[in-house]
């Protein structure tokens, strides 16, 4: 085998003079400074409030595989058999975001490793649905799933060139603990990031 690396957040909008403060239950707080930022954040919150996060299982194989192919078109997408294994394994913690129309627009796959560590194996968001907070919501869900199963430490890998993902993980409390030379099949380096949940 190759190496395998539901609750909607409540949204509160509070207006204060020119700026808008937006807070959701996952702890996101934003103070936009410009009208353009305010409009972007409001549209992001509207998009996430119209989508639903739910558990994902073996029945989602084909849709998850297709979305994985779109999200990781750089050659790092998993094959169908690996996705099947991940979704059906007893130690997996998997969630998806469903948009209106029952379309899967994002997913996360976590696995509890033999040493008891939670491993975020894959986090994918459809390109046209990025920057709307779906990745943050899914990370919250997978961490909660790990906690319910007694996991206190979570790890993940991210490309050294993927600054956007690194920023998200750092904001969520992950720390870079090691650089892994030529970790990806493309030859790119990766960072190992770790977070203590307890």
Residue ranges and their predicted role:
Residues 139, 162-165, 182-187:
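Short glycine/proline-centered loop/turn elements that form peptide/ligand docking sites
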Residues 157, 170, 175-191:
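Conserved catalytic-core motifs of GNAT/GCN5-like acyltransferases
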Residues 37, 92, 153-159, 189-198:
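Conserved catalytic core of the tyrosine transesterase superfamily
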Residues 146-157, 180:
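Conserved GNAT acetyl-CoA-binding A-motif
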Residues 55-61, 65-128, 132, 139-141, ...:
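Acetyl-CoA-dependent GNAT
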Residues 15, 19-59, 195:
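Conserved N-terminal entry element of GNAT/NAT acetyltransferase domains
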Residues 72, 107, 129, 168, ...:
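Conserved hydrophobic/aromatic "anchor" residues
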Residues 3-5, 17:
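Intrinsically disordered, low-complexity segments enriched in small polar residues
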